Structures are given as C-alpha cells and as structure tokens.
C-alpha cells in the first residue's frame, strides 16, 4: 500500500509553545466502533504528530484538527507497512492525541499580553 497524501496544513489557534505547555486531555484517535473519532474535529493539538516515513509533521502544537487529518492518521495506523507515528501517545491502550482541554484556549487568551 502506498502512503496516503498528506493533508493540508490547517490554521493555528494559538502559538505552538503555548499549546505544548498546557496540560491538555487525551482523546482516542478511534471511537468505540473503531472509526475515526469525530470528537477530535475542531480540537487544538498540543503535540507534534509526525509519521515516519516520510518524517513530515501532520500536526504541530496549536494546530486545529480537521476530519481530513483524523482520517489520514487512521489510515496510517491501519497500514501494514511499519510506519512510526511520533507524538501519538497510548492512553488506556488506545492511540490518543493530546488536545487542549475545554477552557484552556480561553485561559491562554486571558493571560496573553500580546
């Protein structure tokens, strides 16, 4: 199977450094039925997610997650080839993404001096 095309870069909701240092929460990549988890749509990633190969980040901290990105990560996970997924954590035995918890983005904006 060939590598799926990388999804387009989406907008940043905040500075990468700010998202990375928030506590966040972990949400599984797949839902209870083993399908791409729609609960991730619109959430803000806290970590850099990089499949290797090719070694090009799919998500960076502060980036908004889209259905296309969720579908891409799911396809990569299901491929038979051995592709390392740097930044994707396992939580309760499930591959998960660390995303900003509710209220963290607003709290960041309130603290911002920009």
Where are these regions (language model features)?
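Non-catalytic terminal extensions of PLP-dependent enzymes
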Residues: 1-114
């Amino acid at each position: 199977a060939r590598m799926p095309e990388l999804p387009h870069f989406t907008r940043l909701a905040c500075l990468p450094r700010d998202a990375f240092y928030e506590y966040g929460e972990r949400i599984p990549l797949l839902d209870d039925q083993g399908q791409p988890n729609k609960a991730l749509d619109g959430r803000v990633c806290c970590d850099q997610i990089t499949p290797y190969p090719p070694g090009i980040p799919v998500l960076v901290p502060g980036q908004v997650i889209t259905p296309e990105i969720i579908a891409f990560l799911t396809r990569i996970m299901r491929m038979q080839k051995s592709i390392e997924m740097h930044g994707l954590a396992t939580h309760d035995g499930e591959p998960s993404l660390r995303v900003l918890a509710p209220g963290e983005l607003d709290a960041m904006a309130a603290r911002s001096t920009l």
